[in-house]
From Swiss-Prot:
Key enzyme in the regulation of glycerol uptake and metabolism. Catalyzes the phosphorylation of glycerol to yield sn-glycerol 3-phosphate. The lineage of its organism: Bacteria, Pseudomonadati, Pseudomonadota, Betaproteobacteria, Burkholderiales. It is an enzyme of class 2 (transferase). This is Glycerol kinase. The gene is glpK. Its EC number is 2.7.1.30. Glycerol binds at residues 83-84, 135, 244-245. It comes from the Bacteria. It catalyses: glycerol + ATP = sn-glycerol 3-phosphate + ADP + H(+). Belongs to the FGGY kinase family.
Length: 499
């Protein structure tokens, strides 16, 4: 396998990306293309599935060409993707019968309430690890079957195929030869039993979704089959699939029970590897499958924060306090601390572990001495505080004391935020050299399947440290900071609950 590389396809919510990795896990070339966001009604979010495919195929070819290579240089392809986003297509034509309904879409919220009223919540959580929510794929499939003309009849005839974005890409890369998904994506549908590792007939019946629509569920790292498209002249093994947060956990090499990563993006996604047994959360976290390699399954606890880096965008676009995101660190550093100011950025409610949809953004502790720098500091602090709330819930659920926090995503470049995160969590925040951990995770899963890398131990040895942030704030100050945050959260909830 001299001079061969792994191609990782990272199909995200706003863009399709492709990256070529070498044997040491270094990025050799990249390509990226944004695509259209479709908002037919308030609360509805859609993508054009054909555009998802065309942009992803385009950047795959571009990344390889940019590196001066062709398909013969690629040992395998790994796919990682935005999760839960739902596509239904006609098996005979290969054409979608409706746009992709995106994970953010809330059109099925009322239907989810009906399912809860029927008493299904406990059963769904016990089987799938998930709460009943429009976030997940199941109710989106049901909406398409109920609202697209002729869909129900075609489904009964076995003509319709459902897939998350990974399934759609594999279907197109193999010209309809493979209709598959992996366990991580299946575990986000609200239809997959994470204990038996099978589609759940009882849930399919409750939601009136024909089993014939569903893809075959495979491991996250195995050779599924070769590409058959004209994107590449030669056939390349498709060999790794994982949802974006699962791939990031693997790319961060959080392969042991109790290891945790936090991706600081627009929101924050915190995931803890819990080993070979699923842990049912008592603290409003989601239980999910981390990945499957061979027969080995790893489970995870996950907590999502709605507003992470988005709070910095609000300071820029909403308040005009900063001109660009990079300025926030300089402004926030100009004061020694937030001076008692707390920002609860519940612009769209509060996510894990609070799950309060009615809460709204609130600013506390403001005096005549409060400056834009204090507000900037409070905004950065809020990202760290929300992360601590989730991490403490993970510790409570798992009974595992977190040893360190591995960090990635755009906002982890902010040294002030990372230091404060370490301070109030009381453990090191560790930033890797390769920041593209999601794509790297997909590459690793594919490379393992084809023997490009020998085993996980070899991958562990590749993980390189950029910077370690060690707690430095005295315990009394940490306690005072956290007590103030808890008061702010209580007050924000009280504001939401007061008529």
């Amino acid at each position: 396998m001299q001079d061969q590389y792994i191609l990782a396809l990272d199909q995200g919510t706003t863009s399709s990306r492709a990256m070529l990795f070498d044997r040491l896990g270094n990025i050799v070339s990249t390509a990226q293309k944004e695509f259209q966001q479709i908002y037919p009604r308030p609360g509805w979010v859609e993508h054009d599935p054909q555009e998802i495919w065309s942009t992803q195929a385009g950047v795959a070819a571009e990344a390889v060409t940019r590196a001066g290579m062709n398909g013969t240089s690629i040992a395998a392809i790994g796919i990682t993707n935005q999760r839960e986003t739902t596509i239904v297509w006609d098996r005979e034509t290969g054409h979608p019968i409706y746009n992709a309904i995106v994970w953010q879409d809330r059109r099925t919220a009322d239907f989810c309430d009906q399912l809860k009223e029927q008493g299904l919540e406990e059963k769904v959580r016990a089987k799938t690890g998930l709460p009943i929510d429009s976030y997940f794929s199941a109710t989106k499939i049901r909406w398409i079957l109920d609202n697209v003309e002729g869909a129900r009849e075609k489904a009964k005839q076995g003509r319709l195929a459902f897939g998350t974005v990974d399934s759609w890409l594999v279907w197109n890369f193999t010209k309809g030869g493979l209709h598959i998904t992996d366990v991580t994506n299946a575990s986000r549908t609200m239809l997959f039993n994470i204990h038996s590792l099978k589609w759940d007939d009882e849930l399919l019946e409750a939601l009136d979704i024909p089993r014939s629509m569903l893809p075959e569920v495979r491991a996250s790292s195995e050779t599924y089959g070769p590409t058959k498209t004209t994107v590449f002249a030669s056939k390349i093994p498709l060999a790794g699939i994982a949802g974006d947060q699962h791939a990031a956990l693997f790319g961060q090499m959080c392969t042991e029970s109790g290891m945790v990563k936090n991706t600081y993006g627009t929101g924050c996604f915190l995931v803890m590897n819990t080993g070979d047994k699923p842990i049912e959360s008592k603290n409003n976290l989601v239980t999910t499958i981390a990945w499957q390699i061979g027969d080995q399954i790893n489970y995870a606890l996950e907590g999502s924060i709605f507003i992470g880096g988005a709070v910095v965008q609000w300071l820029r676009d909403g308040l005009g306090i900063i001109r660009n995101a990079a300025e926030i660190e300089t402004l926030a550093r100009s004061v020694p601390h937030c001076d008692g100011v707390y920002l609860v950025p519940a612009f769209a409610g509060l996510g894990a572990p609070h799950w309060n949809a009615r809460a709204r953004g609130t600013l506390f502790g403001v005096t005549r001495g409060t400056s834009s720098a204090h507000i900037a500091r409070a905004a950065l602090d809020s990202i760290a505080y929300q992360s601590v709330d989730v991490l403490k819930a993970m510790e409570a659920d798992s009974g595992i004391r977190i040893g360190e926090l591995r960090v990635d995503g755009g906002a982890c470049a902010n040294n002030l935020l990372m230091q404060f995160q370490a301070d109030i969590l009381g453990v090191d925040a560790v930033r890797p050299k390769v920041s593209e951990t999601t794509a790297l995770g997909a590459a690793y899963l594919a490379g393992l399947a084809v023997g490009y890398w020998k085993d996980v131990d070899e991958l562990q040895s590749q993980w390189k440290l950029d910077r370690r942030f060690t707690p430095a704030l005295p315990h009394a100050e940490v306690k005072a900071c956290l007590d103030g945050w808890k008061r702010a959260i209580r007050a924000a909830k009280a504001w939401a609950d007061t008529p």
